[in-house]
């Protein structure tokens, strides 16, 4: 019963406009060569900067400048902006879903009636 309801919830989330918009925007972001290249480089630089920090060192100023430049580049990309908006909207949906689940758990925890359907 619980597994069925969870799968149904997952199916409904997958059919939601928020998820569909997220999927479309991520597909477009993947297809955008410039944005993908910048995002890969950002990920690489962040990882390298983290290694410096873990060693107790400051990342070189050139690295910080490149990170800033890449962030500015990607933040003005309309495909990236749509992906961020879609992710934010999906995150809001998932927060609401989690609130509904928590509410159901609280209600179920105090209920003396056991339902099997």
Identify the function of each model-found stretch:
Residues 1-117:
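Terminal, compositionally biased segments used for targeting/anchoring and flexible tails
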């Amino acid at each position: 019963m619980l597994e069925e309801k969870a799968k149904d919830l997952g199916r409904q989330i997958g059919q939601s406009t928020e998820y569909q918009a997220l999927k479309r925007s991520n597909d477009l972001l993947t297809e955008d060569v410039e944005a993908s290249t910048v995002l890969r480089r950002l990920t690489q630089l962040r990882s390298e900067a983290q290694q410096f920090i873990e060693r107790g060192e400051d990342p070189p100023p050139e690295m910080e400048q490149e990170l800033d430049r890449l962030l500015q580049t990607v933040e003005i990309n309309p495909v990236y902006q749509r992906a961020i908006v879609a992710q934010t909207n999906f995150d809001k949906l998932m927060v609401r879903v989690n609130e509904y689940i928590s509410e159901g758990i609280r209600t179920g925890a105090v209920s003396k009636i056991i339902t099997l359907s």
